[in-house]
Amino acid sequence: MSGGLDILSLKEDDITKMLVATTHLGSENVNFQMEQYVFKRRADGVNIINLGKTWEKLVLAARAIVAIENASDVFVISSRPIGQRAVLKFAKYTDTTPIAGRFTPGAFTNQIQPAFREPRLLVVTDPNTDHQPIMEASYVNIPVIAFTNTDSPLRYIDIAIPCNNKSPHSIGLMWWLLAREVLRLRGTISRTTEWPVVVDLFFYRDPEEAEKEEAAAAKELLPPPKVEEAVDHPVEETTNWADEVAAETVGGGVEDWNEDTVKTSWGSDGQF
């Protein structure tokens, strides 16, 4: 599919990324139409996908996307949560139209409803979960590109990209590779330089883990608590106030109110 050109061949760096993201690991079951993409079957029953054919189909899919004059007529779809972030990032960098989450039935066939759309090309994450848009696309003759596992059905799919579509890292990497190849074919980025967008942006993030990471990052930004230094205060000498009162009493400094020399008679005669 790459036409035998070295410039379109699979690079060692991309192969390493695919192996790390487990893109080559399929499921234990094999659809009879996907047997041509299976390289080998392991002893534990897992089928190994031929990454050479994966890259050839990815380049073919990128050429089909670039052939559409208006990029917004290309719809990228993912009903599964693990592919929704990758779909949104792909649409951001390639100017395509994303549908992340639940697909509205009749969006391609029912012209009365407000959500009616007329795309020229579909790219779906999983034929099993995205069966509704694939079925509706077959009614109105819309070509479909799909990331398919070894057990995925290929009915109504025009270009199948064999890969592990059940792993969040594998799905994110495949959308990233497809976006990079589309931009290279358009001439937006060069093949000789590295694309500055990292693949981590396309990976699915668990909301709970994201909240924990944000909380930990916010905690690191907080200033450390102030530690008060110990201050040595001078110790005052204790005074025995009882001794001072006793000394004043002995010295005669206290008046005796019982020895009053003035006598007063409260009688009516006024005499003492």
Swiss-Prot record:
Nucleus keyword on record: yes
Keywords, alphabetical: Cytoplasm, Developmental protein, Nucleus, Ribonucleoprotein, Ribosomal protein
Broad class of the protein's primary localization: cytoplasm
GO CC entries: cytosolic small ribosomal subunit; nucleus
Subcellular location(s) per record: Cytoplasm; Nucleus
InterPro entries per record: Ribosomal_uS2, Ribosomal_uS2_C, Ribosomal_uS2_CS, Ribosomal_uS2_euk, Ribosomal_uS2_euk/arc, Ribosomal_uS2_flav_dom_sf
Molecular functions per Gene Ontology: ribosome binding; structural constituent of ribosome
Region (Disordered): 250-272
Pfam family name, one: 40S_SA_C
Highest taxon above the source species: Eukaryota
GO BP term, example: translation
Keyword Secreted in record: no
Transmembrane segment boundaries: none
Comp. bias regions, Polar residues: 263-272
Functional note: Required for the assembly and/or stability of the 40S ribosomal subunit. Required for the processing of the 20S rRNA-precursor to mature 18S rRNA in a late step of the maturation of 40S ribosomal subunits. Required during oogenesis and imaginal development.
Self-association and partners: Component of the small ribosomal subunit. Mature ribosomes consist of a small (40S) and a large (60S) subunit. The 40S subunit contains about 33 different proteins and 1 molecule of RNA (18S). The 60S subunit contains about 49 different proteins and 3 molecules of RNA (28S, 5.8S and 5S). Interacts with oho23B/rpS21.
NCBIfam families xrefs: uS2_euk_arch
Recorded family membership: Belongs to the universal ribosomal protein uS2 family.
HAMAP family linked to this entry: Ribosomal_S2_euk (MF_03015)
UniProt protein name: Small ribosomal subunit protein uS2
Organism for this UniProt entry: Drosophila grimshawi
